[in-house]
Amino acid sequence: MLENIRIVLIETSHSGNIGSAARAMKTMGLTQLCLVSPKSVDEQSYALSAGAENIVKNARVVDSFDEAVDDCSLVIGTSARLRHLQNTLIEPRECAEKVVAYKGKIAIVFGRERIGLTNEELLKCHYHLNIPANPDYSSLNLAMAVQLVSYELRMAFLVQNNKKNSLSLIEKNYPTTDQLAYFFDYTERIYQSLGFIQNQGVMRKLKRLYYRAKLEKNELNILNGMLSAVEKRIDLTKEDN
């Protein structure tokens, strides 16, 4: 899912910001970087990427905003809290939730260091992402903004994955109470015949062990099959004697 997210940097003037943004992306599992008319991509870009050189190296470099987002069906642009954008303003957490729920390609666009995105560029965005920083000092540099948004994207991605894992647990086929009771009775009977269980304390511990294991039905069938094989061996031994 994260591979569908493209971070777009518009006309970045400080080459080091490109490297720092790439580092911020990689720490959160993002890999798709697009640069629109950067002033330069140089040694400082690579030096400040600090292990994310591959993201800088593989960054797509284009000439315009339109070219950067041409194959994306959801475009989110960073913006100050402007009155005429109130209906489309979202904060990083809401942005991340929308992004991870989306099926197509997504571009998250960060504007120029000094002036951000132009009004024309903002009009081409479906949503406008505003970071609710301290109003008395709201100055975030480009890489900081990328790090913050990338973090929220990763957290939303992990939450979504946890939900999927929870659903997969629910969908697993677990034995009924009656089936477990049959298994426990069968286990106790076989183990008693082997002389393994001398008192109920051992059986209680075995039950706790099996409950902790959260046996699925097919796993219980395997254990019942093992008990059946042991029972047949016991019967054969009795016949031989």
Swiss-Prot record:
The entry marks the following residues as binding S-adenosyl-L-methionine, namely: 78-80, 111, 131, 138-140
Arranged from A to Z, the UniProt key words for this protein are: Methyltransferase, S-adenosyl-L-methionine, Transferase
- EC no. given is 2.1.1.-
Tell me the enzyme class.
Answer: transferase
Q: By its UniProt entry, which Pfam families does this protein fall under?
A: SpoU_methylase
GO molecular function per UniProt: RNA binding; RNA methyltransferase activity
Pull one GO CC term from this UniProt entry. Answer: cytosol
What GO terms describe the biological role, i.e. biological process, of this protein? tRNA nucleoside ribose methylation
Q: Which family does it belong to?
A: Belongs to the class IV-like SAM-binding methyltransferase superfamily. RNA methyltransferase TrmH family.
Write the protein's name. Uncharacterized tRNA/rRNA methyltransferase HI_0380
Write down the species: Haemophilus influenzae (strain ATCC 51907 / DSM 11121 / KW20 / Rd)
